[in-house]
């Protein structure tokens, strides 16, 4: 998306160097990229929408096209599902934005069906996930590997597969606030969604951790054998992260990287790395060794 808007390869080279070496991004470049990131949130990644923006730079046209796509999604749900299943899928889809807007962002089934049972809705969530329309992030009992064995499948957040579509599904015209740089606490759900989208597209599974004792970590990511902790901060107080501090202090828990994505510039304080939001593009899977030779010594047999 950035390249489609004319960002040069030399800029990406500079950014990658800053990311890998914990160097500050030049101020003018940093401020411009924050604006481009806000544009990416609003426009999203749907090819036709991106092309419309590149051709016209008309946010009104972008939003109208996004709302047409949302309507096409609803038509697809009607076309490719039947009966009660169709009703459930539509109810889930239409509630994603409002559920994310809640304080803890967790998907609460009884908000769409007072007598609903998760086992009756499981296939509906799977339908939306398999279609790439929605991205579930599951809570874990503890932020340790292997995360898949620690998942609590009945506790999850449900993100929209494309953040531009999430913005378009919010009827308050928040696009203009975002483009003005007003990424305050009320935009936290939008910001968290774009990170879920980016992390998932990087090939990672989505998990989070929440407990009364430690608080909540936005993303707990299994990266190879290590567990990375990611916090997404929308405000100016991004160096306040009590849950991250508490979890990091648990003696028996071992972690890889501890990253805070924020509006600030690149910085490292002890073991916590601070990166601007737009640098999520450089957060990638650990490279696996090309060869791993293992042979048992049989000489003692």
Language model: regions and residue ranges:
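Domain-level recognition of nuclease-like catalytic cores that cleave nucleotide substrates
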Residues: 264-301
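Amphipathic alpha-helical "lid/sensor" segments that cap RecA-like P-loop NTPase cores
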Residues: 10-68, 79
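Short, glycine/charged-rich beta-strand-loop motifs at protein surfaces that mediate ligand recognition
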Residues: 184, 229-234
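Nucleic-acid endonuclease domains
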Residues: 162, 213, 241, 296-301
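Structural motif
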Residues: 226-230, 257
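Accessory nucleic acid-recognition modules appended to NTPase machines
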Residues: 46, 50-226
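Short, small-residue-biased leader/transition segments that mark boundaries at the very start
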Residues: 1-2
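Catalytic cores of nucleic-acid endonucleases
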Residues: 234-278
């Amino acid at each position: 998306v950035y390249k489609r808007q004319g960002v040069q390869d030399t800029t990406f080279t500079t950014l990658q160097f800053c990311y890998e070496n914990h160097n500050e991004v030049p101020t003018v470049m940093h401020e411009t990229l924050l604006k481009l990131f806000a544009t990416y949130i609003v426009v999203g990644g749907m090819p036709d929408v991106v092309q419309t923006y590149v051709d016209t730079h008309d946010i009104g046209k972008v939003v109208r096209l996004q709302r047409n796509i949302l309507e096409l999604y609803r038509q697809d749900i009607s076309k490719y599902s039947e009966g009660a299943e169709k009703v459930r899928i539509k109810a889930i889809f239409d509630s994603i934005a409002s559920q994310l807007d809640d304080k803890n962002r967790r998907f609460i089934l009884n908000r769409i069906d007072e007598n609903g049972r998760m086992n009756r809705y499981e296939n509906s969530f799977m339908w939306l996930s398999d279609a790439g329309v929605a991205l579930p992030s599951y809570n874990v009992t503890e932020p340790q590997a292997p995360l898949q064995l620690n998942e609590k499948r009945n506790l999850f957040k449900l993100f929209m597969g494309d953040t531009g579509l999430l913005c378009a599904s919010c009827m308050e015209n928040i696009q203009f606030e975002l483009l003005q740089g007003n990424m305050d606490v009320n935009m936290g759900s939008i910001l968290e969604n774009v990170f879920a989208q980016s992390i998932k597209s990087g090939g990672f599974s989505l998990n989070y951790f929440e407990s009364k004792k430690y608080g909540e970590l936005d993303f707990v990511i299994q990266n190879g054998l290590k567990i990375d902790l990611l916090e997404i901060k929308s405000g100016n107080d991004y160096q306040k992260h009590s849950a991250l501090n508490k979890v990091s202090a648990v003696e028996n828990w071992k972690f890889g990287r501890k990253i805070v994505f924020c509006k600030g510039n690149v910085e490292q304080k002890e073991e916590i790395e601070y990166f601007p939001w737009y640098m999520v593009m450089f957060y990638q899977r650990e490279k696996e060794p090309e060869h791993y030779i293992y042979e048992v010594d049989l000489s003692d047999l």
